[in-house]
């Protein structure tokens, strides 16, 4: 009898548990690894969305040194980009003209800004006045020739192709019609930024700068319309090395501008076709360098290498006012071939960071007391290109 009662009691307890008399066990909390895997899966699903189902957006592109606005969406889109190749005569420097081959009428071509996972649809037109076919090789594209074959376009024709921006970074695009070096040397290059899905940190000012080397028949400064010199190009002996296609393109009245206390980001490219750039801003230290436009970040950098056909992103805070000179620190290129730019910064002086000259006394020899102050001797006259540098 006792055994029957015990069995009945156990059975009733199991019945109560089955009917919810006991609280249900909670599912284990999601681990960070599981959350990351779920996020990755969601991103992969978005990346695999057929391009025909994506929202369509017309790209906002900009001429240098302006930069398109940051991406403010959290989903992929089909981004339509229109490009036109134009061959035109423009000023290389005062009194010197050159027949440039361009994307959209200037050197560099327009800057393009898209988001990782976007499908980029390119409508590529070659102006009827062009003398040769042109195309575009996007270093941001994965696939045959970066789109060069798909965009090979005769004068007066338009071609269309698309690619998916699979990997974030800052990439060069350039013409790749033979002779490739000649097309690039005449100015056919630009930058496309593929923002990571999470975006880039906010900064106060952004600028677009591309270095290039030019090969004219005449020496630097020789007046008139200067033709391209293939022999100099093959020998890698440029007469001009410049930022944004022209001597003084970002100097003097065209200088970049910022205010003390602002953080500046520069998207720096090197169209080449031959030279590697040693990019430096005199009087500044780069807080961050996105090495070769990729994911790796170096900090506290004085100068950074920008390879031909490559790029870098540099960021720095301008603490005090002044005129900061941008150079290729292969320094004869700066002072003798044109690779000079300016960032003019306004604001209040801060002597805690740097003072003006505090004294000027006559040299008295090692260990001797300073001699009486005397008027400073006149310095040798600076060349026109050096007057605003230091």
UniProtKB/Swiss-Prot annotation:
Annotated positions binding substrate: 139, 280
Catalytic activity: nitric oxide + Fe(III)-[cytochrome c] + H2O = Fe(II)-[cytochrome c] + nitrite + 2 H(+)
Gene Ontology molecular function: any one: nitrite reductase (NO-forming) activity
Lipid addition sites, S-diacylglycerol cysteine: 19
Entry EC no(s): 1.7.2.1
Binding residue positions for Cu cation 1: 134, 175, 183, 188
Sequence repeat intervals: 371-375, 376-380, 381-385
Lipid attachment in record (N-palmitoyl cysteine): 19
Locations listed in the record: Cell outer membrane
Keywords: Cell outer membrane, Copper, Lipoprotein, Membrane, Metal-binding, Oxidoreductase, Palmitate, Repeat, Signal
Region of interest called 3 X 5 AA tandem repeats of A-A-S-A-P, as start-end residue ranges on this chain: 371-385
Signal sequence, start to end: 1-18
GO CC terms, sorted: cell outer membrane
Cofactors that this protein relies on: Cu(+); Cu(2+)
Principal subcellular localisation of the protein: membrane
Bias kind Low complexity: ranges: 368-390
UniProt keyword Lipoprotein, yes or no: yes
Binding site for Cu cation 2: 139, 174, 329
Ranges where the record places region Disordered: 30-51, 367-390
Subunit structure of this chain's protein: Homotrimer.
Record-given protein name: Copper-containing nitrite reductase
Source species of the chain: Neisseria meningitidis serogroup B (strain ATCC BAA-335 / MC58)
Phylogenetic classification of the source organism: Bacteria, Pseudomonadati, Pseudomonadota, Betaproteobacteria, Neisseriales
Gene: aniA
